[in-house]
Amino acid sequence: MKVTDVRLRKIQTDGRMKALVSITLDEAFVIHDLRVIEGNSGLFVAMPSKRTPDGEFRDIAHPINSDMRQEIQDAVMKVYDEIDEVVPDKNATSEDSEEA
């Protein structure tokens, strides 16, 4: 099974969640509500989950082997990094781009 599409929307907040993601597997199955989270050891992809009545979070969908988990992580982070490269600096002004 391969990740054939990644749709990512960055979140502009001060929180730990940095993006919401949908992935397509084999151009046939979509999983929504993955999240890019800033953890203590850097960014990682969290699977969609819901809160149980006792307050714990349980994954709704998740890979069952480490190879698939790594493929999802790599595909999502590649798109996340590409979007980071294209997003202009918030502090840049129109004069900065004219000088270049």
UniProtKB/Swiss-Prot annotation:
GO BP annotations of the record are: division septum assembly; sporulation resulting in formation of a cellular spore
Query: Which top-rank group of organisms is this from?
Result: Bacteria
Q: Which keywords does this chain's UniProt record carry?
A: Cell cycle, Cell division, Septation
> Which protein family is named in the record?
Belongs to the SpoVG family.
Q: Which HAMAP family match?
A: SpoVG (MF_00819)
User: What the protein does?
Assistant: Could be involved in septation.
According to UniProt, the name of this protein is: Putative septation protein SpoVG
